Amino acid sequence: MLAVRRSKKLWSIGVLALVLGYSLYFSWLTVGVHRGLGSSAYDFGLYDQGIWLLSRWQSPFVTLMGRNLFGDHSSFILLFIVPIYWVTTSTSVLFVVQSFALGFGALPLYAYSRKALNSDAMGFIFAAVYLLHPAVGLTNVENFHPDSFLGLLIGVVLWSALERKWNWYWISVVLALLVKEDVALIVIPIGLWVALRRDLRRGVWTVVVSLGTMALMFLVVMRSFTGVAFRNSWRIPFGGFAGLFRVAFRQPLELWKYLTSDDRPTYLFQLLSPTALAFIAAPSVALTSAAVIGANLISTFWYQHQIGYHYSLVIVPSLMFGTVYGIARVPITYRKRMVGAVAVCSLAFGYWLSPLPLARSTVGDWSASNPSVVAAKELFAVIPDDAVVSAYHPLTAQLARRERIYSFPNPFQRSLYGPDVFARGDRLLFAEEVEYVMLPTVLDEAANLVWSQESPRFRVVGSNAWWIVYKRL
């Protein structure tokens, strides 16, 4: 008995070491990219500015995108990060938070799999399988997104539903719904599963709460900030919902051609293959991800059906828990083989796609000691902390903690600014209020055309071989 307890403890320590190692490695990796000017306004600087404004008790109107932070996405989960901004001035803190949130997503899967498979060793394997999944590591290096909390929170939702830990269930459901307005697409199917397999009343309430929260976020919160409830209707093919349903029923072959076009089959292959499709043995838990997978495949937005972007992370917990759930329902004599197959597939796809040590995929060279990076940071001192600034987009991620900062060519020429992301080209009314501009010494043709019209109103106050800082006359 003592030996068994010692073995269980060692496997748990191993999982904690695995999670800590992952979190520290990706913290180091992503902070290094940020310090090497590898981050940008989209999608890091805008969150850094918004949370910083909240930490100063100001309205989080993010000038890097021209929208309120909660009008862009209803990510009220970010309010829990605000206190960190009271105690640190590091612009890298969000990358550390994200890495630990993603790393901790392995813990609920370990807690469930060690019990469901009656093996701490298999629990350890599945904790590693989660961290090896390409959608986890690639989300970790894709700037910063509140979606990174969903690996942990949806994992806790599934663990608590499967184990009937109802207090944990409701806490994690509420927190998950605070991450983003469309999280209901995963929580509603989980609620339906709970209603059918665990507790009818709790499952129905999950669906009702999820639908109500989604309606509140779209129709009240986001509409009040941006004037529109749903800014991304352009992502629905065939002209919108009506056209999509019409094609689905009248021209199903056209819909099939669309769903098998571009990289969509490859995306599905990369998403599902790390599980060795073991969830097919009992697919009900894995199927809770079907709505999100379908939405990603249907979307006209290229990024949604690419494994390298954050849209896929929310799917991973359902696939992982579904895989364990499926394996737990086959005869014991086959379990080791199935777990072995999952481990091999995860290692293969982790090596192929995930930005892990010794893996095939890398994030490029973003060194803080690069002369151009050092030169940029030297010139930051020329710009006052309270100045209104327009800067080249990688620089905005370093300068975001101020009330007003714009990603050049904004506000001199609109680009990805305001509720309508397609509005572009006009000079915004407050362009004359910009006090400082920081640009590279060599501009592309479009940027040079914009700046040639504005530069007579500015003088050079700092420069080097790579960068120039201008101040309004």
Give a label for each model feature:
Residues 139-147:
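Short acidic/glycine- and proline-prone juxtamembrane loop motifs at membrane-interface regions
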Residues 186-212:
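Perimembrane helix-loop-helix junctions
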Residues 287-335:
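Hydrophobic/aromatic-rich transmembrane helices and adjacent perimembrane loops
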Residues 1-28, 114, 120, 199-202, ...:
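Start-transfer (signal-anchor) and selected internal transmembrane alpha helices
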Residues 16-20, 208-211, 329-355:
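Signature aromatic-anchored transmembrane alpha helix within multi-pass, membrane-resident enzymes
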Residues 117, 146-149, 154-168, 195-196:
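Membrane-interface transmembrane helices that cradle and orient dolichyl/undecaprenyl
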Residues 46-69, 76-77:
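Extracytosolic helix-loop segments that constitute the early lumenal/periplasmic catalytic or substrate-binding loops
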Residues 100, 104-132, 151-152, 168:
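Transmembrane-helix signature of polytopic, membrane-embedded enzymes
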